[in-house]
Amino acid sequence: MEQDNKEQAMHQPPMDNKMLVPVSNVPVSSGNSGFHQPPATQYLPEMMRSYMASAEELRCNEREWESQLIRSLPEHGVRCPSQLAPIPFQNYCQRSIGRGSHVMPVGSSGTLGVTISFSENLMPQGGLPSSRGVSVMAHSSAPAMPYPMPPTVPATTGSLKHGILLVPGMASAGTHAVAPFMDQMLHSINPCNPEMLPARFQQLLPLDSQDSLVTESNTQEEPFVREPPTPAPEGAESPSTSRGATRRQSPVSRPYVCTYNSCGKSYTKRSHLVSHQRKHTGVKPFACDWNGCTWKFFRSDELGRHKRIHTRYRPHKCDECDREFMRSDHLRQHKRTHLPK
């Protein structure tokens, strides 16, 4: 019996860092507030092979979704979106892949199981790193929220020696994982050029946004051209012309018409017609009786103005310079000289 036990111990692989122990039994480093994950979600993975078999079945069923997720991950180290499964007291671990590192949640909504054996630090959200060499088998049933932004966990040093990560098998979890990458790709593309978008991303845009983008591009291509004013019809008249025609065609009674040699002029008063006909006949009945003056006039008002020359009578006087004038029109013309220039 003792020899069989020795041979079994020789063939058994070392379990220094790969030993599967509960998280609650791991000693906490100095200054750490403790690992406060509920004990109900921490299990000792003694049936690792059964979970690995279930993981292989899930990978076969969800191979298409996994390939899409792996292609979306960058080749060099970039932080994966930590909003895959927001759990209030969720633990994050730093996983080293190639030359980079990213942060992955240990437990998430819709995840059937996660089995990881590694020698690195565990970081609870808001706490200090725990000790190394821990194997965790976590099942979580916390509801997932759409794209929350928990605080980013600082990167810690360490290298992953051995680990198995089960990809979520539910379609809703896959949708939550792919949506952030789609949002980043949509934001990285210029929204003003809908032609640059791939066909699958153009289907994601709402119809009203596509219409607004097409309208904006059309308005940018076509320059603004001012339309010429519409010409008025030929028969139409301007308002000023129509008012003038109405004034000329006003129904004013002019019964007195001159018949001398088809003159055609008409007047409102008979006296005006008589004085007009004197111009045709040349008769000047109003003669000046001043001594030695032989002037004659057609009208009496003209004779009265003429006599002012002889008498020196000037009835129109300027208020500013006291100058006197025989006629009112002469006074108006004189007042223009006093206006400021």
UniProtKB/Swiss-Prot annotation:
PROSITE patterns: ZINC_FINGER_C2H2_1, ZINC_FINGER_C2H2_2
Location of the region described as Disordered in the Swiss-Prot/TrEMBL record: 214-252
InterPro entries reported for this sequence: Znf_C2H2_sf (IPR036236), Znf_C2H2_type (IPR013087)
Pfam families associated with the record: zf-C2H2 (PF00096)
Main location per the UniProt record: nucleus
GO molecular function, one term: RNA polymerase II cis-regulatory region sequence-specific DNA binding
Highest taxon, organism lineage: Eukaryota
Tissue expression summary: Exclusively expressed in testis and ovary. Localized to step 3-8 spermatids in testis and growing oocytes in ovary.
Biased composition (Polar residues): 238-252
Gene3D superfamilies: Classic Zinc Finger (3.30.160.60)
Zinc finger feature spans (C2H2-type): 256-280, 286-310, 316-338
Keywords of this entry: Activator, DNA-binding, Metal-binding, Nucleus, Repeat, Repressor, Transcription, Transcription regulation, Zinc, Zinc-finger
Subcellular location: Nucleus
Family classification: Belongs to the Sp1 C2H2-type zinc-finger protein family.
Matching PANTHER family: KRUEPPEL-LIKE FACTOR 17 (PTHR23235:SF159), KRUEPPEL-LIKE TRANSCRIPTION FACTOR (PTHR23235)
Role description: Transcription repressor that binds to the promoter of target genes and prevents their expression. Acts as a negative regulator of epithelial-mesenchymal transition and metastasis in breast cancer. Specifically binds the 5'-CACCC-3' sequence in the promoter of ID1, a key metastasis regulator in breast cancer, and repress its expression. May be a germ cell-specific transcription factor that plays important roles in spermatid differentiation and oocyte development.
Protein known as: Krueppel-like factor 17
Organism: Mus musculus
